[in-house]
């Protein structure tokens, strides 16, 4: 067999054309110093802000300070094995975490790695933890309710899908309990919940997971945990990781709810990192960008319109809006809401629920101060029946508090004032609710209806809650069609009201009430 020179040159040309060279250029640097999880690196001239850096031993870090002749990076996890002179490599990637339906029902760390002992998570999708929030054009106004199942919240400070509602209060005032009730209440609604635990004891997080499992809520929940014993860097990125996992559902035309418990600890972790990076401290020793730390996180909770969902899913999902509702938690010191981080988060969110130690200790739980708790956008999202019946509740409580303050100095009260005080006491009593005993729309409407039409005027305050629970059971067994109609339509018809009036009369004359 003979090959002529032309054929040989053609073969060589073809080989050269088809040759694929996978050369990857990566910048390498050298560790100059390692202290408290902060590494200074020389030689990474083209590192990006927030880029992942690879250290020896399969450890990663984040480039945070880009200086003239060095890079300040924070190590994500253990750093004891990193020493001076080690080689550090740029990865050319921003930090990404796993996302997808496979995460639901699992407990993961801030990097999305499973920590619940249930084996690996089989998801191939990842998304960057830092994303730009949806723009004004991509959003849709909040007009669908996100029911928490708590009478005090759903009637007075309603939360809508896509809203950011702050839960603020001192330690041990029931902030986590309110958030967990909201998560448990989403069972069967199709809402995916993400609970982000930041800087908490591992035992507390295990307790939360156990409670969620007991109430069947882990089936629709992802728990992201960055415990108190973990590196400050992981506590700092945990909320962003959780938010990215929630955005996966929002961008596919679904609804998600995320709880950040709590952002005060994230701010402290970020302050620690910033001070170790030698960034200039500001008020309360926090860095200058601590407002941006929370605003860029909370702005990602939004309701996106149909066009945006269609664009994000490449036309797969049409005619559906998606939402991510955020319930950030802030812990105050001795009720000081004018501190730096609380005022920042109050100004970012669409309303706040204030929980007070005095109310909690007085047995009013959830310990919500109705006077200073507000929902700036939730009113438009409230269910019709709750909006109609709950309108007078806040007013009744406000008048009661004012009159109660004056009545301490007055010896004799006129009949009208006395009645108003009694009504206020009953309303206060009925706003109490045990943890994990959430109510659906119809059950809540029933209680509010009974308050509004004066059914509790002859019920002693001490027996009000027992009366409410007995009456609910009575209606459930005798008139289930009324509850079904209210739940289906979100409104109470005249016919339903007449049925309830007759039911109340019959219940009051029955043995159940007398007992």
Swiss-Prot record:
Pfam families: ATP-synt_ab, ATP-synt_ab_C, ATP-synt_ab_N. Produces ATP from ADP in the presence of a proton gradient across the membrane. The alpha chain is a regulatory subunit. Its EC number is 7.1.2.2. NCBIfam families: atpA (TIGR00962), PRK13343.1 (NF009884). This is ATP synthase subunit alpha. GO terms for molecular function: ADP binding; ATP binding; proton-transporting ATP synthase activity, rotational mechanism. Its main location: membrane. It is an enzyme of class 7 (translocase). It comes from Neisseria meningitidis serogroup C / serotype 2a (strain ATCC 700532 / DSM 15464 / FAM18). One of its GO terms (cellular component) is plasma membrane. It is a peripheral membrane protein. F-type ATPases have 2 components, CF(1) - the catalytic core - and CF(0) - the membrane proton channel. CF(1) has five subunits: alpha(3), beta(3), gamma(1), delta(1), epsilon(1). CF(0) has three main subunits: a(1), b(2) and c(9-12). The alpha and beta chains form an alternating ring which encloses part of the gamma chain. CF(1) is attached to CF(0) by a central stalk formed by the gamma and epsilon chains, while a peripheral stalk is formed by the delta and b chains.
């Amino acid at each position: 067999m003979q090959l002529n020179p032309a054929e040989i040159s053609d073969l060589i040309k073809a080989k050269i054309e088809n040759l694929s060279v996978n050369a990857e250029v990566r910048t390498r640097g050298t560790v100059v110093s390692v202290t408290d999880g902060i590494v200074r690196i020389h030689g990474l001239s083209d590192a990006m802000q927030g880029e992942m850096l690879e250290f020896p031993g399969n450890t990663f870090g984040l480039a945070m300070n880009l200086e003239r002749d060095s890079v300040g990076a924070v190590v994500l996890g253990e750093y004891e094995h990193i020493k001076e002179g080690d080689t550090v490599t740029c990865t050319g990637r921003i930090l990404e975490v796993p996302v997808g339906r496979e995460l639901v029902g699992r407990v993961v760390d801030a990097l999305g790695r499973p920590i619940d002992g249930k084996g690996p998570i089989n998801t191939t999708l990842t998304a960057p933890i830092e994303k730009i929030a949806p723009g004004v054009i991509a959003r849709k106004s909040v007009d669908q309710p996100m029911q928490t199942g708590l009478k005090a919240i759903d009637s007075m400070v309603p939360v809508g899908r896509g809203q950011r509602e702050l839960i603020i209060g001192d330690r041990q005032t029931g902030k986590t309990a309110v958030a967990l009730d909201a998560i448990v209440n989403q069972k069967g609604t199709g809402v995916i919940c993400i609970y982000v635990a930041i800087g908490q004891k591992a035992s507390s997080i295990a307790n939360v997971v156990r409670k969620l499992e007991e109430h069947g809520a882990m089936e629709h929940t992802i728990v992201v945990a960055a415990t108190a014993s973990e590196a400050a860097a992981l506590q700092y990125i945990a909320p962003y990781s959780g938010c990215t996992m929630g955005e996966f559902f929002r961008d596919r035309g679904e609804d998600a709810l995320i709880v950040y418990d709590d952002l005060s600890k994230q701010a402290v972790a970020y302050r620690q990192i910033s001070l170790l990076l030698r960034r200039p401290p500001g008020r309360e020793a926090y860095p200058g960008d601590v407002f941006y730390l929370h605003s860029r996180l909370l702005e990602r909770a939004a309701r996106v319109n149909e066009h945006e969902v269609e664009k994000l899913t490449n036309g797969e999902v049409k005619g559906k809006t998606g939402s991510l509702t955020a319930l950030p938690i802030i812990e105050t010191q001795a009720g000081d809401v004018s501190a730096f981080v609380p005022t920042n988060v109050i100004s970012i969110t669409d309303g706040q629920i204030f929980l007070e130690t005095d109310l909690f200790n007085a047995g009013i739980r959830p310990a919500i101060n109705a006077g200073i708790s507000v929902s700036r956008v939730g009113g438009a999202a409230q269910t019709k029946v709750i909006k109609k019946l709950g309108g007078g509740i806040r007013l009744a409580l406000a008048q009661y508090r004012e009159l109660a303050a004056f009545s301490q100095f007055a010896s004799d009260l006129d009949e009208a004032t006395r009645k108003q005080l009694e009504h206020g006491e009953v309303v206060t009593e009925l706003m109490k609710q045990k943890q994990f005993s959430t109510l659906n729309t119809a059950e809540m409407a029933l209680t509010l209806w009974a308050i509004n039409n004066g059914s509790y005027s002859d019920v002693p305050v001490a027996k009000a809650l027992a009366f409410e629970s007995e009456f609910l059971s009575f209606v459930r067994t005798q008139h289930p069609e009324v509850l079904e109609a209210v739940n289906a339509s979100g409104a109470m018809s005249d016919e339903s009201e007449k049925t309830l009036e007759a039911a109340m009369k019959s219940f009051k004359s029955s043995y159940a009430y007398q007992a």
